[in-house]
């Protein structure tokens, strides 16, 4: 019974209760729990967009091939490495979706990026994507892919034709994307990489990664200086108003989303610990070892802070806020770039940021 209860807890911790998966047996769940608790590398699979029309698709493949400088490989295993070969492939794909052959706003291709963190061998990523694409799309859809190594994290751009050989079109849903992450993680493990595909929440992470657009804005480029994004500036001003209201004695604003995150994390962490307790009661030494790994994993999880909590803590530290002196809080009418640091003052009382 302990293993059955352990399985139930692991499923809950991995947010699998309502999702149909491949081969979700106890052995597989325990193996997943082991990889997660060991800190296995997490894969990234993302749909970046869809191609509509020959011109759009040609531009996308030109980018993926770096205008013929990066080789493309297709679903038949054919590799195109010369600029002439690559240009011919791009031209062929583009002409197939000329305007007179398609409906308006029709999605012709799906664009995906499959990525691994810095330090993973790029060729292993490419090999895993080759196996993944063949398994997921190879029977019914044409595709091409290209490995990019111009950034620290190796990644592959995969372009798939939406229309299948059987006349049906791809219609990817959220569950499909999650299954594809699982499939890619398995393909990476076949390459010798300890990889997993679990939700951020199952690992105790509540913040979404910063979007590429915001990173680009704040980093700047050849034509734009680094600057704070409007999204971040507005979030800061919203938190400033909240702090001012609390200093003036107003009750904190109840945020339903924060409460939901906190409750979910309590449930997930409780489920992990429940699994650890059940595994500890089994006679199998490997289960007892896994129990200890899970307990250490939960103990090392980050504090349950949302992005708003982090902004609030950062502003409190930045301005050394005194409860009795609301004047040190910048005015709500200011932009974030106009805010100036006030003189140092007495540290504020610690506040519970998890409510």
Residue map of PLM features:
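N-terminal nicking endonuclease/strand-transfer module with a His-rich metal-binding environment
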Residues: 1-355
């Amino acid at each position: 019974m302990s293993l059955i209860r352990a399985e139930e807890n692991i499923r809950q911790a991995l947010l699998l209760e309502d999702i149909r998966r491949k081969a979700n047996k106890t052995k597989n769940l325990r193996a997943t729990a082991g990889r997660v608790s060991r800190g296995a590398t997490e894969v990234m699979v993302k749909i970046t967009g869809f191609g509509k029309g020959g011109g759009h698709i040609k531009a996308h493949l030109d980018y993926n091939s770096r205008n013929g400088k990066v080789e493309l490989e297709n679903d038949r295993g054919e590799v195109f490495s010369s600029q002439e070969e690559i240009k011919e492939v791009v031209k062929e794909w583009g002409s197939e979706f000329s305007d007179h052959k398609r409906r308006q706003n029709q999605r012709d291709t799906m664009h995906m990026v499959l990525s691994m963190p810095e330090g993973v061998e790029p060729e292993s990523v490419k090999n895993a994507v080759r196996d993944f694409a063949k398994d997921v799309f190879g029977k019914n859809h044409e595709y091409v892919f290209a490995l990019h190594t111009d950034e620290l994290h190796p990644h592959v751009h995969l372009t798939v034709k939406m229309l299948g050989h059987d006349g049906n079109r791809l219609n990817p849903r959220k569950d499909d994307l999650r299954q594809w992450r699982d499939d890619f993680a398995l393909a990476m493990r076949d390459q010798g990489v300890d990889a997993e595909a679990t939700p951020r929440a199952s690992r105790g992470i509540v913040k979404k990664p910063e979007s590429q657009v915001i990173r680009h804005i704040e980093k700047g480029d050849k034509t734009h200086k680094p600057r704070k994004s409007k999204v971040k500036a507005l979030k800061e001003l919203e938190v400033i108003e909240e702090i001012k209201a609390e200093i003036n004695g107003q009750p904190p604003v109840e945020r339903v989303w924060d409460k939901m995150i906190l409750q979910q994390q309590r449930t997930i962490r409780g489920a992990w610990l429940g699994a650890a307790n059940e595994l500890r009661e089994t006679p199998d030494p490997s289960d007892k070892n896994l129990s200890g790994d899970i307990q250490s994993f939960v103990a090392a999880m980050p504090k349950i802070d949302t992005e708003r909590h982090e902004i609030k803590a950062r502003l409190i530290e930045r301005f050394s806020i005194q409860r009795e002196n609301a004047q040190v809080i910048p005015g709500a009418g200011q932009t974030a770039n106009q805010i100036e640091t006030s003189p140092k003052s007495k540290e504020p009382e610690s506040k519970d940021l998890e409510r």
